[in-house]
C-alpha cells in the first residue's frame, strides 16, 4: 500500500513543488491586490489548498495524455504511468478526485467564482492535448496557471475588473518565458516525437523570445501597479523580478540543458519578488 501511495505521489509531483509555486504566486498577487492587503483567512486557505490540488490533478491528466510520448523522452520515461507502474485509469481517477475536492473547497464562495472555476478546470484539463497542434502551447499553459487571478478577484470583489485581465495576460507572457526555458531541455526529444513547443517554434530566436516575454510581463505588471496606485515597495519587487529575468538570460544564452532547467526553477524567486513587493506595499499604506 505504501509503495502504491508513493507512486501516486510521484504521479502528482509532490516531490517537485516548483509547478505548484508557479501556480501559487500569481494567485497570491491577485488575492492581495483584490483585497487591498491580506485577504480573509478562509479565502486564503481555500485558494492555497486549491492551487495544490489543481496542480496535482493537472500533473495526473498530463501524464495520461502524454503516456505514449513520455516513453521517448529521457527526462520523463521513468514516470510511473509511462513506466507501466500504474494504470491509465488510475491517473484519470486521481485527477478527477483531486479536481472534485478542489471544487468542493470553493462551494462557500460566490457563484461567479464557481463559474470561473469550471472554466479553469476545462483549460487545465485540455492543456496537455494542445501540444499536438498548437505551436505555442505554453501560452495556453499561462492561461491555465493564471486563472487563479480572475478567480481571486471574483472571490474577494464579486467582479473581475480590467486589472485582473491585465495580470492574466502578464502571466501568459511569464509562462511562455519560463516554460520555453523548460522546453529547451527536451527540444531534441520533442522534435523526434512530433510534439509542438515554443522552444521548437521560436527556433534560433528562443532566447530572444524568452527575454521579450519577460519584458512584456514586467510592463504589464507595471501597468497593473499603476492602475492600483501601488507604492514604492511594489516597484522594488518588480525591479528585483527584472534582475531575476536578467540572471535567467545568463543561464539560457548557451542553451545548456541543465542551465535552462535551472532558469525554469529560478522563476520561483521571480514570483516571490513580485509578491513580496505587493505585500509590503499594502502593509505600509
From Swiss-Prot:
Name used for this protein in its record: 4-hydroxybenzoate octaprenyltransferase
Keywords: Cell inner membrane, Cell membrane, Magnesium, Membrane, Transferase, Transmembrane, Transmembrane helix, Ubiquinone biosynthesis
Organism of derivation: Cupriavidus pinatubonensis (strain JMP 134 / LMG 1197) (Cupriavidus necator (strain JMP 134))
Subcellular location: Cell inner membrane
EC number(s) on file: 2.5.1.39
Annotated membrane topology: Multi-pass membrane protein
Pfam families named among the record's database cross-references: UbiA
InterPro entries in the cross-refs: HB_polyprenyltransferase-like, Prenyltransferase, UbiA_prenyltransferase, UbiA_prenylTrfase_CS, UbiA_sf
Annotated GO MF terms: 4-hydroxybenzoate polyprenyltransferase activity
Keyword Transmembrane part of the UniProt annotation: yes
GO BP, one annotated term: ubiquinone biosynthetic process
Role description: Catalyzes the prenylation of para-hydroxybenzoate (PHB) with an all-trans polyprenyl group. Mediates the second step in the final reaction sequence of ubiquinone-8 (UQ-8) biosynthesis, which is the condensation of the polyisoprenoid side chain with PHB, generating the first membrane-bound Q intermediate 3-octaprenyl-4-hydroxybenzoate.
Coarse class of the protein's main subcellular location: membrane
GO cellular component terms attached to this protein's record: plasma membrane
Catalytic activity: all-trans-octaprenyl diphosphate + 4-hydroxybenzoate = 4-hydroxy-3-(all-trans-octaprenyl)benzoate + diphosphate
Amino acid at each position: 500500500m505504501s509503495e502504491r501511495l508513493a507512486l501516486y505521489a510521484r504521479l502528482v509531483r509532490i516531490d517537485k513543488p516548483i509547478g505548484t509555486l508557479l501556480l501559487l504566486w500569481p494567485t497570491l498577487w491577485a488575492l492581495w491586490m483584490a483585497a487591498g492587503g491580506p485577504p480573509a483567512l478562509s479565502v486564503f486557505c481555500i485558494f492555497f489548498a486549491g492551487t495544490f490540488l489543481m496542480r496535482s490533478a493537472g500533473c495526473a491528466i498530463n501524464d495520461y495524455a502524454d503516456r505514449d510520448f513520455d516513453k521517448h523522452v529521457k527526462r520523463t520515461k521513468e514516470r510511473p504511468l509511462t513506466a507501466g507502474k500504474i494504470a491509465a485509469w488510475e491517473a484519470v481517477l486521481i485527477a478527477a478526485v483531486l479536481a472534485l475536492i478542489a471544487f468542493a473547497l470553493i462551494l462557500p464562495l460566490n457563484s461567479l467564482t464557481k463559474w470561473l472555476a469550471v472554466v479553469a478546470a476545462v483549460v487545465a484539463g485540455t492543456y496537455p492535448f494542445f501540444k499536438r497542434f498548437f505551436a505555442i502551447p505554453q501560452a495556453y499553459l499561462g492561461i491555465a496557471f493564471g486563472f487563479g487571478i480572475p478567480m481571486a478577484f471574483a472571490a474577494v470583489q464579486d467582479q473581475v475588473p480590467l486589472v485582473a485581465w491585465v495580470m492574466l495576460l502578464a502571466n501568459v507572457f511569464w509562462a511562455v518565458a519560463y516554460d520555453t526555458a523548460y522546453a529547451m531541455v527536451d527540444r531534441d526529444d520533442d522534435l523526434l516525437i512530433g510534439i509542438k513547443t515554443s522552444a521548437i517554434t521560436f527556433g534560433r530566436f528562443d532566447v530572444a523570445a524568452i527575454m521579450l516575454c519577460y519584458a512584456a510581463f514586467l510592463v504589464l505588471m507595471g501597468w497593473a501597479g499603476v492602475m492600483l496606485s501601488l507604492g514604492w515597495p511594489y516597484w522594488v519587487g518588480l525591479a528585483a523580478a527584472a534582475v531575476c529575468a536578467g540572471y535567467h538570460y545568463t543561464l539560457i544564452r548557451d542553451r545548456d540543458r541543465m542551465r535552462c532547467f535551472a532558469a525554469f526553477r529560478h522563476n520561483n524567486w521571480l514570483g516571490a519578488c513580485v509578491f513580496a513587493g505587493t505585500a509590503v506595499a499594502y502593509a505600509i499604506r
